[in-house]
A protein has these predicted regions:
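Conserved alpha-helix/loop element of class I SAM-dependent methyltransferases that forms part
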Residues: 16-36, 46-50
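Class I SAM-dependent methyltransferase SAM/SAH-binding core
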Residues: 38-40, 44-92
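A short acidic, Gly/Pro-enriched loop at the edge of an enzyme's catalytic core
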Residues: 90-102
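A short SAM/SAH-binding and catalytic strip from SAM-dependent methyltransferases
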Residues: 100-114
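Short alpha-helix
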Residues: 160-176
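Core SAM-dependent methyltransferase catalytic element
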Residues: 177, 184-205
Length: 205
C-alpha cells in the first residue's frame, strides 16, 4: 500500500465526508438509531456526536482502515459507549440477532461487494431491527449519469475506491431488504456527479 493510500486518501475522504451538506444529511438519519447500533464504515467518526444518548445503548463501529479508525477514535465524544471492530462489512463477525439498528452513511460506495455485505449483515439484526441508510450513488438524470460513468475510473483510485454509479436502492433490495421509506435529492453546493443522495430505512424482506 502506497503513501497516498495510507495517509492522503483517508484524509481526503474524511474531509469530503465532512462538508456542510453531508453533515445536514447525517442529522436526518443518525438521531433515529436506537439500542445496540452497528455502524458500517464508521470511518472518521463523523456520526458519533449525532447519536441520541438517551436511545443508544452502545455503538459497534465497523471500519477496516487503520488510518480511519485513528481518526474516529480522536473524534469519539466522551460518554458514548463505543466498540471498534477493525474489519470489513463482508466479514463483520457480529453475533446473530444482537443488533437493533444498522447504520450506513456514505459507505456502500466503497465496499467491494456491497450487496453481499448487506445480505450477510441481515443476520446481525434482532427480529424488529432496521437499517438506516444515507448514501450517494447513481443519478436518475441521463446527462449526470453519463458524466458519472466518465469520471468514475479516475475518481475511484483517488477517492478510496468510491463508486459513483451504484444504484443504492437497487443494491439494498437485491440484498434482501424491504425499503420502508426513501427520499432522494441532489445535495446543494455539491457537484451533481457526486451529489445524488438517497436516505431512509429498510427491514429484512
Amino acid at each position: 500500500m502506497g503513501l497516498y493510500a495510507r495517509h492522503l486518501a483517508p484524509w481526503l475522504v474524511d474531509c469530503a465526508c465532512g462538508t456542510k451538506p453531508i453533515a445536514y444529511q447525517r442529522r436526518k438519519i443518525i438521531p433515529r438509531a436506537s439500542g445496540v447500533v452497528l455502524e458500517i464504515g464508521a470511518g472518521g467518526g463523523r456520526n458519533f456526536a449525532l447519536y441520541d444518548r438517551g436511545k443508544v445503548e452502545r455503538v459497534i463501529a465497523l471500519e477496516p482502515d487503520a488510518a480511519m479508525v485513528n481518526r474516529g477514535r480522536a473524534r469519539a465524544p466522551e460518554g458514548l459507549p463505543l466498540e471498534w471492530l477493525q474489519r470489513g462489512a463482508e466479514n463483520a463477525g457480529v453475533t446473530d440477532r444482537s443488533v437493533d439498528t444498522i447504520v450506513t452513511t456514505y459507505t456502500l460506495c466503497t465496499i467491494p461487494d456491497a450487496v453481499g455485505a448487506l445480505a450477510a449483515l441481515r443476520r446481525a439484526l434482532k427480529p424488529d431491527g432496521r437499517l438506516l441508510f444515507c448514501e450517494h450513488g447513481l443519478a436518475p438524470d441521463t446527462e449526470v449519469t453519463r458524466w458519472q460513468r466518465r469520471i468514475e475510473p479516475v475518481w475511484r483510485p483517488m477517492a478510496g475506491g468510491c463508486h459513483l454509479t451504484r444504484d443504492v436502492e437497487a443494491m439494498i433490495a437485491a440484498a434482501g431488504w424491504r425499503i420502508d421509506e426513501a427520499e432522494r435529492m441532489y445535495l446543494p453546493g455539491t457537484p451533481r456527479f457526486a451529489g445524488y443522495n438517497v436516505w431512509g430505512s429498510a427491514r429484512p424482506g
